[in-house]
UniProtKB/Swiss-Prot annotation:
Catalyzed reactions: uridine(2552) in 23S rRNA + S-adenosyl-L-methionine = 2'-O-methyluridine(2552) in 23S rRNA + S-adenosyl-L-homocysteine + H(+)
Keyword terms, alphabetized: Cytoplasm, Methyltransferase, rRNA processing, S-adenosyl-L-methionine, Transferase
E.C. number: 2.1.1.166
Gene encoding the protein: rlmE
Protein name: Ribosomal RNA large subunit methyltransferase E
Function text: Specifically methylates the uridine in position 2552 of 23S rRNA at the 2'-O position of the ribose in the fully assembled 50S ribosomal subunit.
Length: 209
């Protein structure tokens, strides 16, 4: 892609972003990101979060999902969040900055979880996008596979998994893998998710024993 084309594409994205009604609402409400609204819509339909829960948030920055979850789980609940990028503190959120793919970071994250299992693992991770699906989709699938591995390690029986996935090669196989681990699996496309985006959200509940 030429610099001229890239510049035009970037300009269109910025124009679309700042005119987006969810971006405007997020700014008015003092929210970290428009992702807050995606999670709110999913919570209204699927009721994933309840007071006192422990939740793992992978790909947490800038904190839209963590910010939402603390309003649902209350003071006795706990969010353990991780991201490669920095994130401003949120009351009720234990944040670890580091690359989730790094074994030392994963070990530190598991230590924060401790011996008790968690009730929800959620993943909004995405790689740096090149704009080429043949490159971006495999990178994304690798990240969500790691998130599913995290579920196997820390998610309690009956627990839930929420993950953003980009549709493309490997999606159907990944969906089958999730269905083998959970009793109920749904695919959501929240209104706050841009229509042209390949992203969907898999909501898996009832972690099998």
């Amino acid at each position: 892609m030429s610099n001229k084309k890239r510049s035009a594409s970037s300009s269109r994205w910025l124009q679309e972003h700042f005119s987006d009604k969810y971006v405007i609402q997020a700014q008015k409400k003092g929210l970290r990101s428009r992702a807050w609204f995606k999670l709110d819509e999913i919570q209204q339909s699927d009721k994933l979060f309840k007071p006192g829960m422990t939740v793992v948030d992978l790909g947490a920055a800038p904190g839209g999902w963590s910010q939402y979850v603390v309003t649902q789980i209350g003071g006795k609940g706990r969010v353990i969040a991780c991201d490669l990028l920095p994130m401003d503190p949120i009351v009720g959120v234990d944040f670890l900055q580091g690359d989730f793919r790094d074994e030392l970071v994963l070990k530190a994250l598991l230590e924060r979880v401790g011996d008790k299992k968690v009730q929800v693992v959620m993943c909004d991770m995405a790689p740096n996008m090149s704009g080429t699906p043949a490159v971006d989709i495999p990178k994304s699938m690798y990240l969500v596979e790691l998130a599913l591995d995290m579920c196997r390690d820390v998610l309690a029986p009956g627990g839930s998994f929420l993950v953003k996935v980009f549709q493309g090669d490997g999606f159907d196989e990944y969906l089958r893998e999730i269905r083998s681990l959970f009793t109920k699996v749904k695919i959501r496309k929240p209104d706050a998710s841009r229509a042209r985006s390949r992203e969907v959200y898999i909501v898996a509940t009832g972690r099998k024993l």
